[in-house]
Design a protein with these regions (language model features):
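Post-Walker A helix-loop "phosphate-sensing" segment adjacent to the P-loop in P-loop NTPases
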Residues: 62-73
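Conserved P-loop NTPase "ATPase switch" module shared by AAA+ and STAND
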Residues: 82-106, 113-122
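Short conserved motifs of the RecA-like P-loop NTPase core
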Residues: 169-182
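The conserved phosphate-sensing helix
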Residues: 182-196
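Conserved AAA+ ATPase "SRH/arginine-finger" region at the nucleotide-binding site
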Residues: 142-154
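A short, basic N-terminal segment
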Residues: 1-35, 40, 201-219
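Walker A/P-loop nucleotide-binding motif
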Residues: 41-57
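Short regulatory helix/loop adjacent to the ATP-binding pocket of P-loop NTPases
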Residues: 125-140
Length: 219
């Protein structure tokens, strides 16, 4: 068969509360999000590796409140008015390139107007070493929750959920095989799923063990 991609049904990424698999590695973050609006602190940072479920948790929060959700790279002065009309602001994938003055101003709005602020990032924001002292003070007074590396049960659930989202049927014994051999990294798990999906479509092959072994070697 040629290397041309064949027709596939559109995949659907489920970001509902009932689709989130809870394990000891993410229990604290999950419980905190679901405690809204009775948060012990109104500003929180949830951090963890790529694919750890931060965006899923953000979407769960978004379903509970009047919310503005935005990627860090899209932050601008225009967000001030928009935030004023919302109850909660979610800033995703915060990094050191963010404007410290802009972030500090948004933080102040959250505190002064009794709003909620959720920031997601790969690393805890108290490790960013901001130059603006007032911003550092805000960070220090906020709640910071980490999501740990996945357990075997969580890896299995992530694989099963993503295969289901993509309308793919994979035998449980093959999922067990993957769990025992894949790198214990959310990023690698995500990369494996995307690569397996891509190459099965290119080759027109079912999700046989042979293909799974090939993809595990590739990543």
């Amino acid at each position: 068969m040629s290397d041309q991609l064949i027709l596939k049904f559109p995949s659907h990424q489920a970001y509902k509360k009932e689709d989130f698999y809870v394990s000891p590695s993410n229990q604290e973050a999950y419980d905190f999000i679901n405690s809204w609006p009775k948060w012990i602190k109104r500003t929180v940072n949830i951090f963890g590796p790529s694919g750890s479920g931060k965006s899923h948790l953000a979407s769960i929060l978004k379903s509970k409140t009047s919310c503005l959700q935005i990627e860090t790279k899209k932050l601008s002065d225009e967000i001030f008015f928009k935030f004023k009309t919302k109850e909660t602001l979610i800033i995703e994938n915060l990094d050191k390139k963010v404007s410290e003055k802009l972030l500090f101003s948004l933080w102040n709005i959250a505190l002064q107007d009794n709003k909620y602020l959720l920031i997601t990032s790969k690393k805890p924001i108290n490790s960013f070493k901001f130059k603006l002292r007032d911003l550092t003070s805000r960070v220090t007074s906020s709640l910071i929750i980490g999501i740990n590396l996945p357990s075997d049960d969580l890896i299995s659930a992530i694989l099963a959920k993503n295969f289901s989202d993509k309308q793919i049927t994979v035998e449980k014994k093959h999922i067990d095989y993957i769990v025992k051999r894949i790198d214990r990294s959310y990023e690698k798990i995500s990369q494996f799923i995307l690569t397996l999906d891509k190459y099965s479509l290119k080759k027109g092959s079912p999700f046989a063990l042979k293909l799974i072994k090939e993809v595990l070697k590739m990543i």
